[in-house]
Amino acid sequence: MKDLSIRNDMAPTVSLLYSAVEENSLRLASIVSHMTHSELYYKGRCQTKNSTAQLLHHITNVDIRWVWRIKENRIPDHIEQAYGPMTDESGRLPEPVNQPDLDELLKRHQHVVEKLKSVCFTLTENALNQPLSFEGDTATIRWGIWHMADHNRYHQAHIEALKKEWKQDVAKYER
């Protein structure tokens, strides 16, 4: 039976929210688990869509920023440098540097989920109400963790659509 787990080592609501992030991370990994390098970097028939690799990099990039907002309400320079910008000069999602393989992209994302887990161990129910700076606005820690899960799931739909298009294109060329 599917359910979100409540951990005894986290505050109940924190645990529920973390569980949603963890569940979506596992689901994401299963969706992309058998992708070839070509499929991972496929941008659709017209080469105008974000590839799965770009989306995985983007999810990781967004999530590490949330972890640091929650942890310190700021994003340190070393994180900006390590993960790169959110968009390129054209305003699009950047390509991952050096075309890392699927295992590397998933390892990077899992590392961020583990960082979130460490932060969640320290959060109390009351801490979830704490406001954080977010894109010129504010959001609570609760909303930030929820957003990590929601954002991941949102891009899973894009990845599924790319997979479908990839399979159709491969089938055309195999005829």
From Swiss-Prot:
It holds the Pfam family DinB_2. Gene3D superfamilies: dinb family like domain (1.20.120.450). This is Uncharacterized protein YkkA. InterPro entries: DinB-like (IPR024775), DinB/YfiT-like (IPR034660). It comes from the Bacteria.
